[in-house]
Amino acid sequence: MDQGTVDSPVTLVIKAPNQKYDDQTINCFLNWTVEKLKKHISNVYPSKPLSKDQRLVYSGRLLQDHLQLRDVLRKQDEYHMVHLVCASRSPPSSPTSDSHFSTTDSSSSTSDSAGPSLSSTPSQEAQANSDGLRHRGNPAATHGLNPAPTGVMQRPEGMPLPMQGGPAAGFPTHPMYMPMQMFWWQQMYARHYYVQYQAAIAASRASSVAPSPSLSAGPATQPVQPNEPAAPMGPNPAPEDRPANPNIQMNAQGGAMLNDDELNRDWLDWMYTVSRAAILLSIVYFYSSFGRFVMVIGAMLLVYLHQAGWFPFRAELQNPRAEEGAQDEADQNQDMQEMERMMDEGIEDDEGDSGEEGPDDPMNPGPHQPGFLSATWSFISTFFTSLIPEGPPQAAN
């Protein structure tokens, strides 16, 4: 090959595989080596890559540094496409995920190979350091010992100590945690069921007897212990004799419900109430005598005052209800003791409402049967009450 052909310039089109830069056109000579071409590329290419970081690929072939371009390039081509690949010196875009997988792989391989000998520990540490991974506080990477089970704290003496409250979420379940976890869930279920049972009892008897504060404060102050028998609870003192308010509305938590719609009425509500009363009185006035009109007004006023709580008509039933309240209190205490014993022994109540007594129990008489006068008065008062709008409910005593 003559000297003119060797010194003739050729055109190379440098293409980047990541498409970060546009294709660059470089003029060189056939007598150049690949190493000289790399140095020229490091000067003219936009990213200024180092020569040792460059990899040139031509027609699917990796070009070595000692090769000359005349031995590689095809003579019939006018433009020669060369792909430039540069080794990245910057850290990867997602080092957290890579380190996580690398640490997981190294931990699993260390746990498998730590049994035969401890002589491979320096080589593993050197390999981990070369990969850019740092194991801080990991006994498997520093001392070559088996890692402690997940969710177990290591004592200074080397004895495993299980954490309180069971294993954390997402961790693998260890066989030693199964009894502890089942016991912990059983205690939580028992406490929740105990609180719900007391709330239901307080809501059921709130209309007749005020709930005892000692029973409602029991679960919050002293949790149920599995190995200690529950102390017997003495009968609570009988509540004071006071009339119960039958118009109390109860909410789901067992307390009196505050109805904002009844307490905060606007002028439209009052206008509607007055118009209903005026229509009723006008009908009675025009279609009856004056005496009947006065009687209806008096009856309406009496019923309204009764609903407002000024004239209670159930004073004769206060003492029987107080006695029934004391009897119900003793029965509820007995039911509480029975339920606590069943929860302490870990027995679930599958028989339904086992604490309720039947109507044939001689110690628990049936409810008070109203007389003829009470039934007649209830019928008449209910009839007139349905015609008169109700007033706002009174607060609990």
Curated annotation (Swiss-Prot):
The keyword Transmembrane appears for this protein:
yes
Query: Record's Gene3D superfamilies?
Result: Phosphatidylinositol 3-kinase Catalytic Subunit, Chain A, domain 1
Keywords from the named record: Membrane, Transmembrane, Transmembrane helix, Unfolded protein response
Q: Which SUPFAM superfamilies match?
A: Ubiquitin-like
Domain of life per record: Eukaryota
Region Disordered: start-end pairs:
87-166, 210-246, 344-373
* Cellular localisation: Membrane
Keyword Metal-binding in the entry? The reply is no
- Report the GO terms under cellular component: membrane
InterPro entries with a match to the protein in the record:
HERPUD1/2, Ubiquitin-like_dom, Ubiquitin-like_domsf
Composition bias type Low complexity, residue spans: 88-123, 210-220
Can you give the residue ranges of the Ubiquitin-like domain? Answer: 10-89
Biological process GO terms, please?
Answer: endoplasmic reticulum unfolded protein response
Main function: Could be involved in the unfolded protein response (UPR) pathway.
Identify this protein by name: Homocysteine-responsive endoplasmic reticulum-resident ubiquitin-like domain member 2 protein
Give the species this sequence originates from.
Danio rerio
Q: What is the lineage of its organism?
A: Eukaryota, Metazoa, Chordata, Craniata, Vertebrata
The gene for this chain is herpud2
